């Protein structure tokens, strides 16, 4: 696995995972922010952990497969024996919406498309790469439900639930999605999962030794 450091969405540098450092990408489907990256890495003085984005990329059979984009939330230096290491925790791009809070009571006008309101909140959160599935549902009354200080992720997911959409989630390429809930059925199968080392479950628990 390669750990790219993105600056302005362009590869700027790379992080090197330490052997035995527990570098891992995990997915928790029912969490508000679903993807997480954690582990210990070699120090890299060129990385700005306040603004840069981390993108793990897994190569299988010569095909590069990105595993999302991550916002560092906790980065500090510790010592592993005689060597200094960077201990890092980061979360997927929906974390931007969780950390973005409204400063005044949010007003949503009657007749506003739910999807338009969700798109506006995503942009206000700093999320620019997103896909919101089209829907003609509109607000049936003026809304001022959310107090100042409410995070935008809470509002987005509440609006999504009202039109039977899933909570927002990030795909492997780093695009944030808001899409309609669909009941599982054989007709709806679009992805086939395998067991073994290439399974999604394996990837969600992968530990890297470099």
Region locations from a protein language model:
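Sterically constrained small-residue positions within well-ordered secondary structures
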Residues: 28-32, 47, 63, 79-81, ...
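Short beta-strand-centered interaction patches in the first periplasmic/extracellular domains
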Residues: 74-97, 131-205
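Juxtamembrane "anchor/assembly" segments of surface/extracellular structural proteins
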Residues: 1-50, 89-97
